[in-house]
Structures are given as C-alpha cells and as structure tokens.
Amino acid sequence: MKKLSFILLLSFIGIYMNAQEHLLPVDKKAKETFYDKEIKRLLIPDDTEFGMICKPSFEFESSLTYDSEAHALIYTEADTSIWSRTFEASHRLERKGESVFMWKSQQITFYRVPGTKMYMLPISDEMAQSLKRLWKVAINQAEFPEKERTKMKTEDGKVITVEIEEIVLDGTGWEYFFKGKRAKIQGDDKGGKGKVGSLINLTIELRNAVRENDSQKCAALQSQIDSLYKEFK
C-alpha cells in the first residue's frame, strides 16, 4: 500500500460554525450517558417547552428554557463543571505501568452534585410563540453539510482528491431542543456568521436579558426574532 503524506495547512482547520446556515442533527440512537442525564436533571426545569443547552469547554454549563406554565424564560447556570463532576464519579484512575495511569469507567460511586442558580423573566405570549416558531424551523432544517475537497500529491507524484475534515479545537457546544427534537452546533461563544451565528447571538442576548432581569431589553429583541425566522424559513 502506498503511503500518502501531506501537510495539514492551518487553512484546513476551520471552526465549523463560521458562516454556517444549518444546525447539525443529533443522533437519537446515541446512548445517554450519566453526564447527559445530569444535564437534563440540573439544567432543564419542569414545564420546559423548548430551550437551549450551552456546554463551554472551559466554563460551566448553562441553559435557556421557556416555562409554559410561568410564561417565562429561565436561565439556569451550574456553579461548577457538570462534566468534571460526572466524569469524576463514573471513572477511576488505574495504574497501567510504573508511571502510566489511565481512566477507566466504573459504576457511579461518590458524586458531588453541582449546584445551580436560576433566573426567571416573564415574556409576552407573542414573543413565546415567535421563539417557538424560530426554534422549530431551525431544528427541523438541521442537516449534515457536504464535505469540501482538495487536491494533494502522493509520494509517487500522483494527484488525488481528498476530503477536508472540519476540526473544532475545543469551543462551545450549543444544543437546541423542541418537542423531543434536538439539533446542535460546535463553535465559539461569540456567535459567528450565517443564520446559525445569528441564532447564537440572539440566544446570548436573550440569556443576558434574563440574567439582568431586563424586560425592556428582552422585548426589544422581538423584531430580531421575527427577522431571523424569515431567514430560516
């Protein structure tokens, strides 16, 4: 078999969310982990109709959800890393040599449950319906993109076409959900370009308004919500 050698150029390494027009589908068949269960239990309150879960690489997890009973947006943030706490409880460090240790999964033992803080801001039914409509269309349009290709030379001088893998170095995970459907994107915490970038930016502004208990700032986002819905539609 002939070896293929090539140089990975920095231009090939892209943050996937940049100029992204669609969210990515979430695998419904994927096994639910202890971490997934704790994210739901700690960050998705009862009576949640739709929402978003934010999973940063170097900060603590949070969520923005809509409570259909309270007619309010709820922002919930963990006071420590849920991922770190669940990993600590479900793994143990095992010696594999004189100076080599490896993490091995185990049954849940001692678990230090993360704390959470919750903020609530009532919104109009009009805004709730607009957000619901936006969430639904954005999630329903989730799709995997076509991979980009480039030409490269093998060691014997032949030119071949290879697929460029999109690589995300850490970043923030954003997962949107509505009535059992979920879609996600991995990128940074500043939104980005394209429709998905605008959706992230809107989510951040809504989150800030709830955290600051600023009804006026939240209401001012109505036109932005309607405009973004038209873009997705």
Feature roles, as predicted:
Residues Q20-K233:
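Function-determining sites in protein domains
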Residues M1-P25:
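Bacterial Sec-dependent N-terminal signal peptides
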